[in-house]
């Protein structure tokens, strides 16, 4: 199955049956980063030339982005783990609502369309329903660059007045280091006249990956990965061949937690350790031995002890690994305190872990987890992407066969997850729900 393929509607009626307490051994391969690949695909809108990406994961979200870009007139061709995008003949500046509604990353199109064409109409985004996740910062930044922006009936309309249809560089100070706003404004600014600075910019590796791609395309960008990004606008961008998407740090972290929760020695590769520093430290703190080299990480779990975590913007502990790490802490010795500081309403997985025997109580955006000796198999549902991953991890550790529903969420972010885990000794089988 190629990245052009989408997982069948059959997954809505299926579940994953997971036989727990199997010891794992071997190497888990990490795919390209979903959150990077999605925004890199939208960057293809900034040039009339061919953009080729490699190490692209095979996910429903990637297929969805391909459909959105195709609807705008982009020629999208998938081959293996590569995707070629040619936006030389755009036919629309408004992605269809029915496609955008299911994918939050679709909103990135507004920055690249506005930068290239001088106008765009983009529906407010969909995706996992985690808290408010507003786009206020994106819009405020686009206005600072000279765009006229209005929101009506769920559609964001933006345009640049004047004959040249080009944005104008400006200083922008974000109220918070939003990844989405940073990436949207970065793409909008690369073709603007003059110089743009983005202060309080997001530091995430995915932002750095986008900047690196744009630089290879001819953009003049400095400071990506730090608090201030400077963009000197250029007249045009060129294409790029075989640009590799960075490894998915969230998938890598999930696999390391899979080793810890099953008390199994595993190797996870490829990994860029600097992208997971906070997670690696917490794994060490809770009793795991890590050996890190240039290509990956070997993990040997010991007796897992409770540790506290607080989600923070990069380089802090990532919110996307909060639910998976909570599953691990549910099996630890002692009591851990897990505080979610990035998104509201991101503790929906607690009730499902409790169904499996986890001892957890919630106080606002904080969960207090008292480790238990054994989780028990139960029918559970992943309410969002990372909650679904947490259910899979809990199922790997539980006594009995756990059935996890909500696979439409899981396949949005984990490439060939059953095959990868089964290859190291797990037993996962998709069944009729």
Swiss-Prot record:
GO terms for biological process: cell division; cell wall organization; peptidoglycan biosynthetic process; regulation of cell shape; UDP-N-acetylgalactosamine biosynthetic process. One of its GO terms (molecular function) is UDP-N-acetylglucosamine 1-carboxyvinyltransferase activity. The modification 2-(S-cysteinyl)pyruvic acid O-phosphothioketal is found at residue 128. UDP-N-acetyl-alpha-D-glucosamine binds at residues 104, 320, 342. It is found in: Cytoplasm. Phosphoenolpyruvate binds at residues 34-35. It catalyses: phosphoenolpyruvate + UDP-N-acetyl-alpha-D-glucosamine = UDP-N-acetyl-3-O-(1-carboxyvinyl)-alpha-D-glucosamine + phosphate. Its main location: cytoplasm. The active site is at residue 128. Its EC number is 2.5.1.7. Belongs to the EPSP synthase family. MurA subfamily. This is UDP-N-acetylglucosamine 1-carboxyvinyltransferase. It comes from Parasynechococcus marenigrum (strain WH8102). The lineage of its organism: Bacteria, Bacillati, Cyanobacteriota, Cyanophyceae, Synechococcales. The gene is murA.
